[in-house]
């Protein structure tokens, strides 16, 4: 999770309260305090609460929680004549763009630092390191609308941020620090995404760098926002968070028309919640009026619409609200967890460590001793990573997400090795060798199982290394096994082995197939090992999902 730095003076000014009160209540709105310094406090929030990754967002939540200002904050959007055109040649490159104008904003140094902070946090949390979403903020008064978002040749040149000379797009990708960091996102594309104004001035080369021409300073009064990406929902989420942050900072929002679509849409989402369901989940006895009052503290619009129903308006920046239970969680936060009465269970029982968990703990120690680093990949994945890239048939018993928030999170993982390969892809420019492992849950047929996966990449990675690692692991665990030739299409034929224990297949190891490596865009050889831990304890029941 990114660490958010909250300067006391700016936060006190926005909240209207002293720093001690702020620090005392920060944990109550969901933050972990990392450091308390002389001029600022550094905090962490869950990645789902992207609206809290700015001083303005924290101040908005704090004012509500302390009942200094309750209910929804209204975000008016005035019409403007500013337009964006998007060229067709970006359809397979970076097709989506969101935009808005912020006028009459007063930016001091602290506000600019906060703006840069939320921009980078959104790049990390929503944008997946700018691959999915990238944000540009520009001084509108230095350019002339209408604007054009198009695919340009690599020979196009402009002066990038922090430089005083023109550079071609190729030079920027090779020489500019941001180019070296992010060029891998677009360098293999047929054209480069570029934003320019009516006079041909370049505003931005997303997702890499803005132009020096539109640098934002304390004298900037009118801002143009651009959010580009490969996922439309993520683009609009980032745009809404950015717009509401700047409105809270004192700006005034105007619309931009992008290929005929007027944006941003900052209107709230409407929903009814059931009072009985909320109380049952939380173990409370709140009335509809009490729940409405609590939700107003959490910056919802809320009114009682019946004895058992509350009508709510969900703020546009709350991209994390996907189910009624998300709202119920806010009821618990707003009421204060300390005010919820704890109850002892009616029955008493003693617990013990599950054998598979004990095995997983021992495996972590063994893998670390073998020189492998433990990683924690996401539980949610998608068909492309799980099956298509691995050259495997889809699992018909996989658990799919009914309403996925993005194309990258459409099912619960059924294997671990594909996720390790995806991590190696993301770190392929890091120093070699890379040896990683993970032991954790997978889900199939509504059952939760424990698996182990290891992966190693370097120029000399081969079958002998995979065999030696597996043999050492099984020997340390005291498990006898027999190797049998594997037909797993994720591995090179003749260089992969099934792990057989008591006549049953418990796993597989070998050299990853070049076709798989190509699909993951990995340049070096990789060996992989995957073991079903639950099969080592056939008498143990799996966990119901």
UniProtKB/Swiss-Prot annotation:
Domain B5, residue spans: 266-342
UniProt record similarity statement: Belongs to the phenylalanyl-tRNA synthetase beta subunit family. Type 2 subfamily.
Matching InterPro entries: aa-tRNA-synth_II/BPL/LPL, B3/B4_tRNA-bd, DNA-bd_dom_put_sf, Phe-tRNA-ligase_IIc_bsu, Phe-tRNA-synth_IIc_bsu_arc_euk, Phe-tRNA_synthase-like_B3/B4, Phe_tRNA_ligase_beta2_arc, PheRS_beta_core
GO BP of this protein: phenylalanyl-tRNA aminoacylation
Pfam families according to UniProt: B3_4, B5, tRNA_synthFbeta
Keyword Nucleotide-binding in annotation: yes
The organism's taxonomic lineage, starting at the top: Archaea, Methanobacteriati, Methanobacteriota, Stenosarchaea group, Methanomicrobia
A GO CC term assigned to this protein in UniProt: phenylalanine-tRNA ligase complex
Residues of the signal peptide: none
Enzyme Commission number, as recorded: 6.1.1.20
Primary location group: cytoplasm
Keyword line: Aminoacyl-tRNA synthetase, ATP-binding, Cytoplasm, Ligase, Magnesium, Metal-binding, Nucleotide-binding, Protein biosynthesis
Catalytic activity, reaction form: tRNA(Phe) + L-phenylalanine + ATP = L-phenylalanyl-tRNA(Phe) + AMP + diphosphate + H(+)
Listed name of the protein: Phenylalanine--tRNA ligase beta subunit
Entry cofactors: Mg(2+)
Subcellular localization, as worded in the UniProt entry: Cytoplasm
Magnesium keyword on record: yes
GO molecular function, one term: magnesium ion binding
Source organism per UniProt: Methanospirillum hungatei JF-1 (strain ATCC 27890 / DSM 864 / NBRC 100397 / JF-1)
Residue numbers binding Mg(2+): 320, 326, 329-330
Quaternary structure annotation from Swiss-Prot or TrEMBL: Tetramer of two alpha and two beta subunits.
């Amino acid at each position: 999770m990114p660490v958010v730095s909250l300067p006391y003076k700016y936060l006190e000014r926005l909240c209207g309260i002293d720093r001690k009160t702020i620090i005392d209540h920060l944990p109550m709105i969901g933050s972990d305090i990392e450091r308390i310094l002389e001029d600022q406090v550094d905090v962490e929030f869950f990645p789902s609460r992207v609206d809290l990754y700015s001083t303005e967002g924290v101040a908005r939540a704090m004012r509500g929680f302390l009942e200094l200002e309750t209910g929804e904050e209204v975000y008016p959007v005035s019409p403007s004549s500013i337009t964006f055109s998007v060229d067709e040649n970006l359809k397979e490159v970076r097709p989506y763009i969101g935009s808005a104008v912020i006028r009459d904003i007063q930016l001091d140094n602290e506000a600019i630092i906060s703006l840069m902070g939320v921009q980078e946090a959104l790049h990390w949390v929503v944008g997946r390191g700018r691959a999915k979403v990238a944000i540009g903020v520009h001084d509108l008064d230095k350019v002339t609308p209408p604007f054009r978002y198009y695919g340009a040749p690599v020979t196009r040149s402009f002066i990038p941020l922090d430089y005083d000379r023109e550079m071609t797009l190729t030079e920027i990708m090779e020489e500019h620090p941001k180019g070296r960091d992010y060029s891998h996102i677009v360098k293999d594309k047929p054209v480069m995404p570029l934003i320019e104004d009516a006079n041909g001035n370049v505003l931005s080369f997303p997702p890499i760098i803005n132009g020096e021409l539109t640098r934002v300073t304390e004298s900037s009064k009118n801002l143009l926002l651009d959010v580009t990406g490969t996922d439309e929902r993520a683009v609009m989420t980032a745009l809404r968070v950015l717009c509401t942050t700047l409105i809270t900072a004192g700006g005034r929002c105007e619309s931009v028309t992008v290929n005929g679509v007027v944006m941003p849409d900052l209107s709230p989402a409407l929903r009814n919640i059931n009072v009985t369901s909320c109380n049952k989940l939380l173990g409370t006895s709140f009335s509809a009026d009490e729940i409405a009052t609590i939700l107003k503290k959490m910056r919802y619009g809320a009114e009682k619409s019946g004895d058992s129903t509350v009508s709510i308006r969900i703020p546009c920046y709350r991209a994390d609200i996907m189910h009624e239970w998300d709202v119920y969680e806010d009821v618990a936060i707003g009421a204060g967890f300390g005010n919820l009465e704890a109850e002892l269970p009616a029955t008493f029982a003693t617990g013990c460590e599950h054998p598979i968990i004990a095995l997983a703990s021992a495996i972590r120690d063994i893998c670390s001793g073998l020189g492998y680093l433990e990683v924690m990949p996401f539980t949610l994945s998608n068909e492309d990573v799980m099956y298509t890239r691995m050259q495997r048939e889809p699992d018909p018993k996989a658990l799919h997400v009914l309403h996925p928030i993005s194309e990258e999170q459409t099912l619960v993982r059924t294997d671990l090795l594909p996720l390790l390969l995806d991590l190696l892809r993301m770190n392929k420019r890091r120093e070699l060798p890379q040896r990683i492992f993970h032991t954790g849950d997978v889900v199939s047929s509504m059952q939760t199982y424990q698996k182990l996966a290891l992966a190693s990449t370097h120029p000399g990675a081969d079958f002998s290394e995979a065999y030696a690692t597996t043999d050492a692991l099984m020997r340390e665990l005291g498990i006898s096994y027999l190797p049998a030739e594997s037909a797993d299409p994720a591995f090179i034929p003749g260089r992969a082995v099934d792990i057989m224990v008591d006549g049953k297949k418990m796993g597989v190891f070998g050299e990853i197939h070049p076709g798989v490596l190509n699909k993951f865009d990995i340049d070096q050889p990789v060996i992989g090992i995957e073991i079903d831990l639950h099969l080592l304890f056939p008498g143990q029941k799996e966990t119901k999902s």
